[in-house]
Swiss-Prot record:
Function summary: Catalyzes the transfer of endogenously produced octanoic acid from octanoyl-acyl-carrier-protein onto the lipoyl domains of lipoate-dependent enzymes. Lipoyl-ACP can also act as a substrate although octanoyl-ACP is likely to be the physiological substrate.
InterPro entries per UniProt: aa-tRNA-synth_II/BPL/LPL (IPR045864), BPL_LPL_catalytic (IPR004143), Octanoyltransferase (IPR000544), Octanoyltransferase_CS (IPR020605)
Residues the record lists as binding substrate: 68-75, 148-150, 161-163
Site (Lowers pKa of active site Cys): 145
A molecular function GO annotation: lipoyl(octanoyl) transferase activity
Other observations noted: In the reaction, the free carboxyl group of octanoic acid is attached via an amide linkage to the epsilon-amino group of a specific lysine residue of lipoyl domains of lipoate-dependent enzymes.
Broad class of enzyme this protein falls into: transferase
Catalytic site: 179 (acyl-thioester intermediate)
The gene coding this protein: lipB
Metabolic or biological pathway, per its Swiss-Prot or TrEMBL entry: Protein modification; protein lipoylation via endogenous pathway; protein N(6)-(lipoyl)lysine from octanoyl-[acyl-carrier-protein]: step 1/2
HAMAP family (UniProt xref): LipB
One Gene Ontology cellular component: cytoplasm
Protein name from the UniProt record: Octanoyltransferase
Length: 218
């Protein structure tokens, strides 16, 4: 059975990296079980393996270069970071299917708050259509990102994971081009007018987890 841990307070990012790497290695060695780790971080930016220097507009907070996929993203208070240390040796060695399952998991959790999350080809993460905002210059509808996804696999065990905006300071995103995508914005559950707290989201994530990541046999 997949273990769940919720970290109290704000978790130092480098300590989180060290913990994830150690746990992923233990899972790969058969010495530990899968883990979903729920944390919040102090304000910081992370740069994934595809990050472009031009997308760091202003280093307002510490910048951490990390080995996960993706580009620049922001972490900070009011954002639920979901670190997923799952064994793809047992769940299927299919990276695309794994990322799709992560996206669907977030979409299922958001649906509990009657919020429709969507995915877009070429734009990993979960998006919210914003017909209430002015359209883009080409006439297409604006979309705001509510959840970013970036994972790394080592010996087919995942780490890093998902960042879902509950009530972060969205102005903190101004220092980067989030995930290298300009033209679209970012939003949060509270920004969408939902009176949702971190505990509410955590419960929704727990309820929807098994639908996307069935329990392992044995």
């Amino acid at each position: 059975m997949t273990e769940w841990i919720t970290a109290p307070g704000l978790t130092d990012y480098q300590e989180a990296l060290a913990f994830m790497e150690a746990r992923a290695a233990a899972i790969a060695a058969g010495e530990a079980g899968e883990l979903v780790w729920l944390v919040e971080h102090p304000p910081l930016y992370t740069a994934g393996t595809s990050a472009k220097a031009a997308d760091l507009l202003e280093a307002r907070f510490p910048v951490h270069a990390v080995g996960r996929g993706g580009q620049y993203t922001y972490h900070g208070p009011g954002q639920r970071v979901v670190y997923v240390m799952l064994d793809l040796n047992r769940r299927g060695r299919d990276v695309r299917a794994f990322v799709k399952a992560l996206e669907n998991w977030v979409i299922d959790a958001l649906a509990e708050f009657n919020l429709r999350g969507e995915i877009r080809d070429g734009r990993v993460g979960v998006w919210i259509a914003r017909p209430d905002k002015a359209p883009l210059p080409d006439g297409s509808m604006r979309e705001d990102k509510i959840a970013a996804i970036g994972v790394k696999l080592r010996r087919w065990v995942s780490f890093h994971g998902i960042a879902i905006n509950v009530e972060p300071d969205l102005n903190h995103y101004a220092g980067i081009v989030p995930c290298g995508i300009s033209g679209h914005g970012v939003t949060s559950l509270v920004d969408m007018g939902l009176p949702v707290g971190m505990d509410d989201l955590d419960l929704a994530l727990r309820r929807s987890f098994a639908r996307n990541f069935p329990p392992l046999a044995g």
